[in-house]
């Protein structure tokens, strides 16, 4: 692992532990055992570090269009991968709106990615319809399901925090229940 990669890893761990607001580049340098100047040789500021962590997270979750889930089983398998990555970068979901407000470059990148992600969720839903796992004939219903799934994935961590629930590696997995509930009324009935 290169020094640059090690700095990102230490920063991610620190952000997850105490949050980005409590983690200056000086804190990251201290946790790395390097001087602040050495850290700044690699990264201009904390926002650049957060932005690069976001880009790394995005790379870990993105599937090529032709590999998007085509059935409920593979969708659930993919959701488990997404949960693991979301837990790994949990600081981002907990502080998303604040992070986007502090860094317009990150905000622009996230909005662009979020629009693309919404299209990808819609493609997954279309795959499930084509493969007769879901029956959705109304475009408005399809948009509602796509948005419900997107909202669940993006804001579940924040939601837990606002109701006093502890977020841990187990509770974060409950987001799958919300995505499943959004699709449940449209599941094709299977004959026994």
Task: Identify the residue ranges that each predicted region occupies.
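Short, Lys/Arg-enriched anionic-surface-contact patches
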Residues: 1-4
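Amphipathic alpha-helical segments used for helix-helix packing
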Residues: 87-108, 123, 158
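Hydrophobic alpha-helical connector segments
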Residues: 65-91, 146
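C-terminal peripheral helix-coil segments that are non-catalytic and often amphipathic
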Residues: 123-126, 152-192
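Short, basic, alpha-helical segments at the C-terminal edge of helix-turn-helix-like DNA-binding modules
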Residues: 55-61
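Hydrophobic alpha-helical bundle segments that form small-molecule/ligand-binding pockets
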Residues: 117-146, 163-164
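Helix-turn-helix
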Residues: 6, 10, 14-48, 52
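Short, well-structured alpha-helical segments
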Residues: 76, 80, 139-150, 154
């Amino acid at each position: 692992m290169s020094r640059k990669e090690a700095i990102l890893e230490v920063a991610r761990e620190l952000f997850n532990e105490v949050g980005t607001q409590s983690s200056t580049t000086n804190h990251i340098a201290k946790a790395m055992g390097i001087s602040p100047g050495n850290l700044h040789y690699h990264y201009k500021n904390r926002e650049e570090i957060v932005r690069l962590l976001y880009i790394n997270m995005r790379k870990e979750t993105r599937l090529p269009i032709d590999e998007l889930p085509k059935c409920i089983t593979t969708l659930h398998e993919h959701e488990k991968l997404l949960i693991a990555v979301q837990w790994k970068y949990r600081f981002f979901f907990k502080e998303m709106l604040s992070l986007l407000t502090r860094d317009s470059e990150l905000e622009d990148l996230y909005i662009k990615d979020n629009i693309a992600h919404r299209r990808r969720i819609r493609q997954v839903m279309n795959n499930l319809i084509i493969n007769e796992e879901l029956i959705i004939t109304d475009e408005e219903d399809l948009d509602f399901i796509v948005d419900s799934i997107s909202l669940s994935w993006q804001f579940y961590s924040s939601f837990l925090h606002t109701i006093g629930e502890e977020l841990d590696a187990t509770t974060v997995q409950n987001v799958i229940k919300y995505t499943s509930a959004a699709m449940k009324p449209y599941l094709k009935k299977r004959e026994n």
